[in-house]
């Protein structure tokens, strides 16, 4: 199990470098992250690294109890790091594509960004990340990618 935890930890750092390599890589990551907005940035990196085409993810328990959906036999979960309690462990989530509805099963609500919200989105990102240029979504995302890359580079060099 320790080998798997090490592998997933290394995958997280590798994905941080990968997605910040260029605006195009960042946009690909953001496409996945936009569907995984309830997950932390680190979890989003791991989700993207293991299955960039996910639509909606949840734990086995959430699929079963909240949505009355069942994970298909043989489905491979997406490993995330769980560091609660001071010990690194793995927890697994599954994409909706790997589930099927049970009796009265629900479809989860899938969030979407709409053109009419672009102004509010730009304003929010500009304020949240203290960005100097909010002329376009591409400009804003490039600036955020630079900040994230710098943060993760510093953390990696410090050994965090």
Over which residues does each language-model region extend?
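N-terminal accessory/interface modules of nucleic-acid-binding and processing proteins
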Residues: 1-160
């Amino acid at each position: 199990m320790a080998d798997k935890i090490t592998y997933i930890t290394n995958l997280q750092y590798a994905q941080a470098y990968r997605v910040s390599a260029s605006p195009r890589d960042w946009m690909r990551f953001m496409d996945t992250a936009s569907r995984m907005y309830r997950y932390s940035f680190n979890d989003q990196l791991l989700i993207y690294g293991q299955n960039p085409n996910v639509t909606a993810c949840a734990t086995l328990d959430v699929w079963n109890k909240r949505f009355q959906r069942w994970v298909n036999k043989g489905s491979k979960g997406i490993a995330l790091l769980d560091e609660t309690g001071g010990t690194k462990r793995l927890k697994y989530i599954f994409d909706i594509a790997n589930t099927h509805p049970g009796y009265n099963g629900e479809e989860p609500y899938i969030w979407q960004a709409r053109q009419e919200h672009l102004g509010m989105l730009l304003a929010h990102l500009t304020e949240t990340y203290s960005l100097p240029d909010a002329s376009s979504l591409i400009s804003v995302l490039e600036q955020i990618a630079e900040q994230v890359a710098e943060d993760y580079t510093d953390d990696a060099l410090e050994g965090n």
